[in-house]
């Protein structure tokens, strides 16, 4: 086994691509490495098309192995389970730029499996997996119009940084991944700290230029180790069947696509489709339904795209840059901490905010290390939102991806945990959908966060843009419908504030999208965003001054770090008693910061007073009210200042001689005691003799507490 290796410098890192030694029964396999982060990528492509196959069955699986980071998985089974949210997102990241590069009509099944086998905590595996998948596909010989390159772009000290390390990313105002061929950008996924449109576009162009070294290296590897190109020929179009479908459907489809209401339009289109299938199959039973549907869909695309290029009104009658009618309601759910309904045309999101304590934070045990997430964003897309029935259960890949995009859009305006000591969860329920539900989630989340009293830096709005391009003519569409997304050449989503962009996602289905076209799309998106923000600000201009009465109040206090063990108590007994008796939640940091959360403010005050008592220093000569905890032949033990136990010797219980302690004291009895001495071991000697009057005792105790 003599592997073929290609090594090249990529920014500050060294990338190695190796093939020919492992998984030789796969169609192609590549071991891709970047500075000790290694991902093994296999491609298996079936030579024969499954009978009746009418779509391209491409599957991308990305899996992280715990051994890659020298760890053993947790849990009962001690092995990796179903894909995590992070693994699902990276699988989508690999899939999105390669899917458009397979030719139309290619229906052979392909499976790509990317397995992380070694990880350097400073190098994220996602980029390595993308490069490995591109190389494996290019080597496989399947009809693939690649290879692609991939680059991560950071923005540190007003400079673009290629493939920043994990440490550098913490200082970066931008996390942008761009993928494309040698000629064109195909995909962008990014999160930004309110950068301008010009900076975002420059980052995309920078990343695309820098990744050319990857594309050239893969091409050189293919020359050495590539398998023969498949002798695949695109199926010849059935012109007779195409003309037959046109004759039956073209005029009627043209009329249907002037119906502005989605459900009515779909009913009409479904009726036309059923009629076309019935007529054609009645004449020729050998024609497959799938083939007719494909031609019918292509005809729909021609009609819609032709009208847009010709400058005619869009499907719902709008001009190219018009945003659909907006409707906003805040505070719609009485017992939640914050809520809003955002409606844009036939797309609607119900966004709900819940405030929690730090113990509600999500602990993410990733290969690159454990981290805590205090801002959670979940997106749900139930089948009723599009008038359908379907399975309801765990989130699908699309829901996870849309939720992450919406979270990226809002993250830049969220306060830090020191500014607002709450864990924040946003849930976006899509109740209606006709395009751009993820951007509706951004708008709804921004409104609900303000309704909840979360001190966000500013409002955020999102907009989805589309593109129709025919040869040299192109039209950029604002606020696309679901049909325009499906039939167009680009899905371009931008979220941001009045001053800049917070998230940008782009998926391009064709080559030839120039920076000029992207600039026009960004500028048009900015105009739409300003319009939406204006309407949102009329509904709620700033975060509410007070959080919901049903949300927990979080108060902080400082104690001496040496006293933390006293507040926690033996085996957690003291803190458990405090929380159970007062109904509060208590978290203590190593620096002595105590965070107390409760819906009832009086409960918080009680806990704070008790913690102050527990952490107070016992003073010799001071008088305290204590509780008898246990009796002995030689005296009684009394707890003062919460849980500090001292001894009242039998000779110190009363002025007269005491024969039996139980004649004078009982367990649980409250008594006045004076501190005689605190010895070197910290033991407290108490006396009940020579105690001043009760009134003076009370004054003395008050003085102690006030100090």
Curated annotation (Swiss-Prot):
NCBIfam families: polynuc_phos (TIGR03591), PRK11824.1 (NF008805). It comes from the Bacteria. One of its GO terms (molecular function) is magnesium ion binding. It is found in: Cytoplasm. GO terms for biological process: mRNA catabolic process; RNA processing. Its cofactor is Mg(2+). Mg(2+) binds at residues 485, 491. It catalyses: RNA(n+1) + phosphate = RNA(n) + a ribonucleoside 5'-diphosphate. Component of the RNA degradosome, which is a multiprotein complex involved in RNA processing and mRNA degradation. This is Polyribonucleotide nucleotidyltransferase. Keywords: Cytoplasm, Magnesium, Metal-binding, Nucleotidyltransferase, RNA-binding, Transferase. SUPFAM superfamilies: Eukaryotic type KH-domain (KH-domain type I), Nucleic acid-binding proteins, Polynucleotide phosphorylase/guanosine pentaphosphate synthase (PNPase/GPSI), domain 3, Ribonuclease PH domain 2-like, Ribosomal protein S5 domain 2-like. GO terms for cellular component: cytosol. The keyword Hydrolase does not apply. Its EC number is 2.7.7.8. Residues 552-611 form the KH domain. The gene is pnp. Residues 621-689 form the S1 motif domain. It is an enzyme of class 2 (transferase). The keyword Protein biosynthesis does not apply. Its main location: cytoplasm. It holds the Pfam family PNPase. Involved in mRNA degradation. Catalyzes the phosphorolysis of single-stranded polyribonucleotides processively in the 3'- to 5'-direction. Belongs to the polyribonucleotide nucleotidyltransferase family.
